[in-house]
């Protein structure tokens, strides 16, 4: 049995395909039961969010498990496997563990360090438990992953990494608008006369987890903001501009329900993608983060939207990879484009890189620890079987000896039987301890196999070791 993870995400598939691959909580149990009902899977967990659909499984064989999972994903998407295959990624054993740990820590998210994924992984695991399709290996894996995710967010500042990109982008946009639109500086929050730059610095610093009271003008006071995309980045952008004092905030998304959900959270209006051209014409700031495979806003469309606008400046903040906004819009009068490249220059990347590297180091350590424990657990049933076999031999031989030495009193018999047991324990101590040590190395399973062969141990030993049986292992 081995671990296998197969899926597609915002890096490997366009939004249209991710939407087809999405599985609701109501439909997930059937998908899970279909998976474990296949020939090569014994356990499964389905993680489906707006940016990824992934299946984690314990499989009997790699190729058989891969075929079963790929076929299921093809059925979910309604896309032939020949068309879907190029968008899938496959992780086996250690890489599957590392991938899950990276996902739950937010390293694989569009918005690096976002915490929403931790709750989504927890929900996926609970759903699999409720469907009774995971118990042993995957239960252990996901429980460990959730613990690792909590460590990442409590022991590092990874939460601020993605938030910094959004906040710095909004800060740059606010500076640009303030420089070209003095009329925006009309909404004092507390004390008049505060430098607008100080207000922006105070309001839009990376710590976005709690509201911040700001003295001075709101940096986006009265600004009309259009946000294209309703994922984690879009939602954070809506939160950020609201706290910066934006006036009318509009959320546009290809999925109306998702746009409405984000809009409701941040006192905004929801519109469809068809209304983008109209809303661009009204906006002072446009923030885009759709994850689309091509441009969402083109040069000609923006030029048409600017008609009748006069001298009012327009700022585009493109937070998408690949880019959403046509770079040629920079050529249009009154238009400023701030993209990822500009943000990388403006953002102090040293701390962000430090936080990401700290989490990667944590993931590496936790993956190694998980794999070591897993290899040791695989050996434990063999050690239990060996000690149980030895105990049975000792018991039978002592019973035979008792019939041959009937004149021994209880004290003498205790001495004899105790000596025999100690001799057997000492003989078994070195090989059982050593096989557990060797099991922690790559290929360690072969040593347990050799032990079974040498002592002719049964192969149907339990995969899950009971508490009394663990005593036999710990005695080594």
Curated annotation (Swiss-Prot):
Q: What does this protein do?
A: Catalyzes the NADPH-dependent reduction of glutamyl-tRNA(Glu) to glutamate 1-semialdehyde (GSA).
Which GO molecular function annotation, any one, does this entry have? NADP binding
Where does the record place a coiled coil? none
Catalyzed reactions: (S)-4-amino-5-oxopentanoate + tRNA(Glu) + NADP(+) = L-glutamyl-tRNA(Glu) + NADPH + H(+)
InterPro entries linked to this entry: 4pyrrol_synth_GluRdtase, 4pyrrol_synth_GluRdtase_dimer, 4pyrrol_synth_GluRdtase_N, GluRdtase_CS, GluRdtase_dimer_dom_sf, GluRdtase_N_sf, NAD(P)-bd_dom_sf, Shikm_DH/Glu-tRNA_Rdtase
Protein name, please? Answer: Glutamyl-tRNA reductase
Upper lineage:
Bacteria, Bacillati, Actinomycetota, Actinomycetes, Frankiales
Which organism does this sequence originate in? Parafrankia sp. (strain EAN1pec)
Protein's pathway: Porphyrin-containing compound metabolism; protoporphyrin-IX biosynthesis; 5-aminolevulinate from L-glutamyl-tRNA(Glu): step 1/2
Highest taxon in the source lineage: Bacteria
Keyword Oxidoreductase listed: yes
Q: Which residues bind NADP(+)?
A: 229-234
Q: Which residues form the active site?
A: 50 (nucleophile)
Domain writeup: Possesses an unusual extended V-shaped dimeric structure with each monomer consisting of three distinct domains arranged along a curved 'spinal' alpha-helix. The N-terminal catalytic domain specifically recognizes the glutamate moiety of the substrate. The second domain is the NADPH-binding domain, and the third C-terminal domain is responsible for dimerization.
Any one Gene Ontology BP term: protoporphyrinogen IX biosynthetic process from glutamate
Could you describe the subunit structure of this protein? Homodimer.
Residue numbers for the site described as Important for activity?
Answer: 99
Q: What else is known?
A: During catalysis, the active site Cys acts as a nucleophile attacking the alpha-carbonyl group of tRNA-bound glutamate with the formation of a thioester intermediate between enzyme and glutamate, and the concomitant release of tRNA(Glu). The thioester intermediate is finally reduced by direct hydride transfer from NADPH, to form the product GSA.
Instruction: Provide this UniProt record's keywords sorted from A to Z.
Output: NADP, Oxidoreductase, Porphyrin biosynthesis
Keyword Oxidoreductase belongs to the record: yes
Q: Name one Pfam family in it.
A: Shikimate_DH
Q: Which family does it belong to?
A: Belongs to the glutamyl-tRNA reductase family.
Provide the binding site for substrate.
49-52, 109, 114-116, 120
The protein's matches in PANTHER family, at most eight in alphabetical order, are given as:
GLUTAMYL-TRNA REDUCTASE
Which E.C. number(s) belong to this protein? 1.2.1.70
